[in-house]
Amino acid sequence: MYKLWLLFDPRRALVALSAFLFVLALIIHFIALSTDRFNWLEGKPAVKAA
């Protein structure tokens, strides 16, 4: 496993991984915001009263 870090610079690899995960989280949240069920910004109640 240590030979992997001889091929890649650990700082650049961890920065790239962090940037990728941040962008992935943004994409997931924007997809959730585009649905009616998970759009928490519109102000609609989550569960309608019976």
Curated annotation (Swiss-Prot):
Q: Which ranges of this chain reside in the Periplasmic compartment per its record?
A: 34-50
- InterPro entries linked: Antenna_a/b, Antenna_alpha, Antenna_alpha_CS, Light-harvesting_complex
- List the subcellular locations: Cell inner membrane
PROSITE patterns, sorted: ANTENNA_COMP_ALPHA
Any GO MF annotation of the entry: metal ion binding
Q: How does it sit in the membrane?
A: Single-pass type II membrane protein
Report residues binding a bacteriochlorophyll: 29
Q: What is its main location?
A: membrane
- Provide this UniProt record's keywords sorted from A to Z: Antenna complex, Bacteriochlorophyll, Cell inner membrane, Cell membrane, Chlorophyll, Chromophore, Light-harvesting polypeptide, Magnesium, Membrane, Metal-binding, Transmembrane, Transmembrane helix
GO cellular-component term (any)? organelle inner membrane
Disulfide bond residue pairs: none
Family note: Belongs to the antenna complex alpha subunit family.
Q: How does it assemble?
A: The core complex is formed by different alpha and beta chains, binding bacteriochlorophyll molecules, and arranged most probably in tetrameric structures disposed around the reaction center. The non-pigmented gamma chains may constitute additional components.
- State the protein's purpose: Antenna complexes are light-harvesting systems, which transfer the excitation energy to the reaction centers.
Q: What's the protein called, per UniProt? A: Light-harvesting protein B-880 alpha chain
